[in-house]
UniProtKB/Swiss-Prot annotation:
Transmembrane segment boundaries: 6-26
Name of the protein: Penicillin-binding protein 1A
Pfam families attached to this UniProt entry: PCB_OB, Transgly, Transpeptidase
Coiled-coil segments: none
EC number: 2.4.99.28, 3.4.16.4
UniProt GO MF annotations: penicillin binding; peptidoglycan glycosyltransferase activity; serine-type D-Ala-D-Ala carboxypeptidase activity
Compartment(s): Cell inner membrane
GO biological process, one term: response to antibiotic
Membrane topology, Periplasmic segments: 27-809
Keyword line: Antibiotic resistance, Carboxypeptidase, Cell inner membrane, Cell membrane, Cell shape, Cell wall biogenesis/degradation, Glycosyltransferase, Hydrolase, Membrane, Multifunctional enzyme, Peptidoglycan synthesis, Protease, Signal-anchor, Transferase, Transmembrane, Transmembrane helix
Residue numbers spanned by region Transpeptidase: 411-749
């Protein structure tokens, strides 16, 4: 007996010691874990990751950036039945317990003890899931489980039940980069929460358990099983819905499919510029902070720009030969539509041109083709008219080709991906706001932004900058310069003999006519007359870097490597009266709470805000290397130009706090150049632009050697626009693909939309000018140049040879 009592005493002692040790261990663990628990008060001001939204100036969606889809909602925006679906699925006693479901924990412990499973369901309330989602990792351990329980109790003590449920619904992962119930509803069903049906609510409630492997797109069978057998039945058991409602929902097939937010304005190159600028400004996290970025892009103009570039490149291809099918696939004679469509997998649409595979052709010249969505299209015989070959001789079964919508609804035309590229950039000339930007034919195919990154030779479209320097130096539009052969020789004995494009010479001619006709030899002689150093320094006033401009006479022919955006910026100086503006794209930035955190305040061109700068660069001389500036035969006092009856553009004075753009060049030089460039449109290389029926259209075409580049830069109304066409491999565009043929039609089509209902921009002579007759032409001349004009017309001396030789250094 005593021995038994001794054993019992020892056993009791051991049990007491073990209990104490257990209590101490548990207490130590509790202290160790609880002391390291995060402050859950942050949940009241939690910032969930949200994508960045980019909008046009008129509020249309351009792009959404970010690794996740999330659109946080308040609990009051969640329909009651949707809340019930989640409660039935995840935590039926959510509004009853204090964060811990002890029944669920007991059930989980029993399963652990009676099975060989290491992980068992049950035991995690919605509050515990919130604790895990925000503060813990996914490690499966008792230590993490204890931390989860402790955090859940703390959360329940400081947050209301609806606040906890709101956090859960906004934080949970639903697969396919969708976080939160609102993003899931939009992605899987393209609906807002209040538009969901019961079957859709139940499907969404079943996703968080298996978000990647059990969502209704990845595995619709598994998702339906969970919806029907678990979620809906649990809702019935809890009296959230009736059995009839559940049966009706179960009868509906799974119909989820990807739904991306509807992009309202296609401007991918501009959107990428915004993305890069936001990262530079706020760091990589900028894409997940829910910023709303409003750009300067005009939705209507951007869509017009995209359409114009696509049409222009399609027409370019139509002028050249059909290159054949994009690829050919051998298909079985009995292959059905679905089999044919499967061959298009991985072939994306580009620039509005859709890939199709030829099913068959008809003797009448039509072709039946299949799209990737399994739909069939009939191409009429006219679809290949531009190739000069009927469709039934051009195509065969299995050919993969491109089509795009025709002018009439339901019509399709045969196309081919263009071998050339094009870019269009359009600015508000008065403040530099980017209104439209197209960086290439297809952002999908190539993300290289040719508007801002491609450096190409502008050719003759650079000449207005050289002519501007000459006018500043003392030339005037009526100055006579010989269009005659000339040979330049450097110190090493190398010679350069520039040529006109047509290989002909017109002899002495006014520089106005030389610009209108784009005579190369006159441009070279002008530059040689005013000096390379002077010209380079002067041209930097347009925003170019001096090291971008070649330090030789070839500069006058546009051999500098410049971006289309920089050319447009330079032309803006002519369009706005002589001020240098800075292009800009981001107008406003709002945070996730729609609070304004950034507002751009660009420098604005304003002629009435500053006195006219009539001495921007060096003083002029009366004679430059023997060139006559024109003899005045009659001088009249300055008088205003007659205005027509059309409305004219008047630029309102800006707010006093608006920064002023610096004056770049003399406004009188601007007036002369604008007048000359308007003549380029009226009677020069850009007469096609007369179809716009406006008197304020001015610009200059540009082409480079072997037709590698084609340009048109010009302005009208408030906009300055540059269009470039060329090939990325610097190969020729083809015979006679000049700027007026390849680029100008794109410019015209775009500006027809851009200038609709816009007032006519004036070009009135500013103060400090006198109207006089020079060399048989009436021109406006700067007052200080009147006394410098020669008393005789320039004539080549008879003793001079046809070819003159100059030294160049």
């Amino acid at each position: 007996m005593y021995r038994l009592r001794g054993w019992l005493g020892w056993l009791l002692t051991i049990l007491i010691i073990l209990t104490l040790v257990g209590i101490l261990a548990a207490g130590s663990m509790y202290y160790a874990i609880s002391s390291k628990l995060p402050d859950i008060r942050n949940l009241k001001q939690v910032e969930l990751q949200e994508p960045m939204y980019v909008y046009s100036h008129d509020g249309l969606l351009i792009a959404i950036f970010g690794e996740i889809r999330r659109y946080p909602v308040q609990i009051k925006e969640v329909p009651e039945q949707l809340k019930q679906a989640f409660l039935a699925t995840e935590d039926a006693r959510f509004y009853e317990h204090s964060g811990i479901d002890y029944k669920g924990i007991a059930r989980a412990i029993w399963l652990l003890a009676t099975t060989n499973e290491k992980r068992v369901p049950g035991g995690s309330t919605i509050t515990q899931q919130v604790a895990r989602q925000f503060f813990l990792n996914s490690e499966y351990s008792y230590k993490r489980k204890l931390a989860e329980i402790l955090l859940a109790r703390k959360i329940e003590s400081q947050l209301k039940k609806d606040e906890i449920l709101e956090l859960y619904l906004n934080k949970s992962f639903f697969g396919n980069r969708a976080y939160g119930i609102a993003a899931a509803a939009e992605f899987y069903y393209g609906k807002k929460l209040n538009e969901l049906n019961l079957d859709e609510m139940a499907s969404l409630a079943g996703i968080p358990k298996f978000p990647s492997s059990g969502n209704p797109i990845t595995n619709p069978a598994r998702a339906r099983e969970r919806r029907d057998l678990y979620v809906l039945q649990r809702m019935v058991d809890l009296n959230f819905i009736t059995q009839d409602q559940a049966n009706a929902a179960k009868a509906i097939p799974m119909h989820a499919k990807p739904h991306e937010p509807p992009v309202q304005v296609y401007a991918p190159y501009a959107a990428e510029m915004v993305r890069q600028e936001m990262i530079a400004k706020y760091g990589g996290a900028a894409l997940n902070k829910g910023y709303h970025v409003t750009t300067t892009i005009d939705g209507t103009l951007q869509m017009a720009a995209e359409t114009s570039v696509r049409n222009g490149l399609a027409l370019y291809e139509h002028r050249h030969r059909w290159r054949g099918a994009e690829q050919h696939i051998e298909v079985d004679a009995n292959a059905d539509t679905a089999t044919l469509a499967a061959h298009l997998s991985g072939i994306s649409s580009q620039g509005g041109m859709f890939p199709v595979i030829v099913a068959r052709t008809t003797p009448e010249g039509s072709a039946i083709v299949v799209r990737s969505d399994r739909s069939e299209l009939t191409l009429p015989p006219a679809a290949s008219r531009w190739t000069g070959t009927p469709l039934n001789k051009l195509l065969k079964r299995g050919d993969v080709v491109r089509v795009r919508p025709g002018e009439k609804r339901g019509e399709w035309t045969l196309e081919q991906l263009p071998s050339a590229q094009s870019t269009l950039v359009s600015l508000d000339a008065n403040n530099g706001a980017l209104r439209a930007l197209v960086g290439g034919f297809s952002f999908t195919a190539n993300k290289f932004n040719r508007a801002t990154q491609a450096r190409r030779q502008p050719g003759s479209s650079f000449k207005p900058f050289v002519y501007s320097a000459a006018l500043e130096k003392g030339f005037n539009p009526a100055s006579i310069v010989p269009d005659a052969p000339v040979i330049f020789r450097d110190r090493r004995g190398h010679t350069w003999s520039p040529q006109n494009d047509d290989g002909k010479f017109q002899g002495p001619m006014r520089i106005r006519d030389a610009l209108v006709q784009s005579r190369n030899l006159v441009s070279v002689r002008l530059l040689d007359a005013i000096g390379i150093d002077f010209a380079r320094n002067y041209i930097t006033q347009f925003g170019f870097e001096e090291n971008e401009i070649p330090p030789n006479l070839s500069m006058s022919l546009g051999t500098a490597s410049l971006t289309p955006l920089s050319i447009a910026r330079g032309y803006a100086v002519f369009a706005n009266g002589g001020f240098r503006i800075d292009p800009w794209l981001i107008d406003e930035i709002h945070d996730r709470e729609h609070k304004l955190i950034f507002k751009n305040n660009p420098k604005v061109a304003c002629s009435s805000c500053t006195s006219a700068n009539t001495n921007v660069t060096q003083s002029t001389s009366h004679l430059v290397d023997g060139f006559n500036f024109g003899a005045p035969t009659k001088t009249e006092p300055s008088k205003p130009v007659k205005n027509n009856n059309e409305p004219t553009q008047t630029i309102p004075s800006p707010d006093p706090n608006t920064p002023m753009a610096p004056r770049a060049i003399d406004e009188r030089v601007v007036f002369q150049l604008v007048s000359m460039m308007r003549d380029v449109v009226l009677r020069g290389t850009a007469t096609a632009a007369r179809s716009l029926n406006r008197q304020d259209i001015a610009g200059k075409t540009g082409s480079t050697n072997e037709h590698r580049d084609a340009w048109f830069s010009g302005f009208g109304g408030p906009y300055v626009t540059t269009v470039w066409v060329g090939r990325d491999d610097f190969q020729s565009l083809g015979y006679r693909e000049y700027g007026g043929k390849a680029a100008l039609p794109i410019w015209i089509e775009y500006m027809r939309t851009a200038l609709k209902d816009k007032p006519i921009a004036r070009n009135a002579p500013p103060q400090g000018m006198t109207q006089t007759t020079l060399n048989g032409a009436t021109e406006w001349v700067k007052n200080e140049d009147i006394n410098h004009l020669q008393d005789h017309d320039f004539k080549l001396h008879e003793e001079e040879s046809d070819e003159q030789t100059f030294d160049i250094f």
